[in-house]
């Protein structure tokens, strides 16, 4: 039933289906010019957009369900708030996987991409990514009262996520100030984790920082969302309770400070981007370069 309700949500369909495919063909056909190696390089950012779409789609869906009284119907059943939120995440995950699979299929059939790196790492990064960004969407839905408020807050969060993380513009191409800010964003770790897994075939133990940071953040945001969850549109949460939502920024605030000192992701993303540019200059066949140094 949760899957059927999710499919009725236009926001979810746009951000988790239509937008990812639009970016896929834009990146693969225009930016990569159909070159298989370049398409493979861009698959990480493209798939990350599909994964992050669960944030916008789920927050909008939950607020809509609350305004329309659908959550009230669930409330009279033995379903707990944790059950409701968990089922929402599972529904988004089940519906996001076909989008990711189709993007990989199109890359193979249309653009001739051979091999997609370490698929186990890709699946794990997609899984923790969907759970973490969907949980953030649940937090937004819990602290906003109307769809208008939800859309405003989503925009404020969404724009930095897609423009400063490497999802739409390579991190190596961003100004240094934007790069320094980007490492505070969870999307940056999702984008690089997927790109490292697909382009460099990185096993999951080489992506421990990206995977564990997203997993820890998912647990925290889900817990906060469960504490703030409301079944009724008339229910309000105290203003001081919203500080729980602000606490969800703490993990990546600390990780961003550390990363700005270490510079690991910035160096690796620059090396990856330069390797693709070097390949273009030498006009060699679509061989995948050796991975950068292990973390």
Could you tell me what each predicted segment is?
Residues 121-144, 165, 216-225:
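Hydrophobic alpha-helical transmembrane segments of polytopic membrane proteins
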Residues 2-71, 82, 88-96, 100, ...:
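Transmembrane helix-boundary elements of multi-pass transport/secretion proteins
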């Amino acid at each position: 039933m949760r899957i059927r309700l999710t499919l009725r949500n236009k926001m979810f369909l746009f951000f988790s289906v239509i937008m990812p495919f639009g970016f896929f063909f834009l990146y693969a056909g225009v930016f990569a010019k159909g070159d298989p190696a370049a398409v493979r390089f861009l698959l990480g950012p493209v798939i990350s957009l599909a994964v992050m779409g669960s944030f916008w789609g789920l927050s909008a869906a939950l607020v809509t369900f609350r305004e329309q009284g659908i959550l009230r119907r669930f409330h009279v059943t033995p379903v707990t708030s944790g059950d409701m939120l968990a089922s929402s995440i599972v529904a988004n995950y089940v519906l996001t996987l076909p989008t990711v699979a189709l993007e990989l299929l199109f890359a193979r059939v249309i653009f001739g991409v051979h091999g997609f790196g370490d698929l186990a790492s890709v699946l794990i990064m997609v899984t923790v990514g969907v759970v973490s960004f969907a949980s953030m969407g649940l937090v937004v839905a819990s602290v906003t009262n109307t769809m208008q408020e939800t859309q405003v807050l989503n925009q404020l969060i969404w724009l930095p996520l897609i423009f400063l993380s490497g999802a739409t513009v390579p991190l190596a191409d961003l100004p240094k100030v934007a790069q320094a800010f980007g490492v505070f964003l969870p999307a940056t770790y999702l984008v690089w984790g997927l790109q490292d897994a697909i382009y460099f075939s990185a096993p999951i133990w080489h992506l421990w920082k990206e995977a564990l940071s997203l997993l820890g953040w998912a647990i925290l945001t889900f817990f906060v969302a469960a504490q703030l969850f409301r079944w009724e549109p008339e229910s309000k949460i105290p203003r001081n309770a919203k500080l729980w939502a602000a606490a969800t920024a703490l993990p990546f605030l600390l990780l961003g400070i550390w990363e700005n000192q270490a510079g690991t992701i910035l160096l690796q993303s620059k090396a990856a981007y330069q390797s693709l540019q070097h390949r273009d200059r030498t006009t060699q066949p679509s061989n995948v370069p050796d991975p950068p140094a292990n973390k």
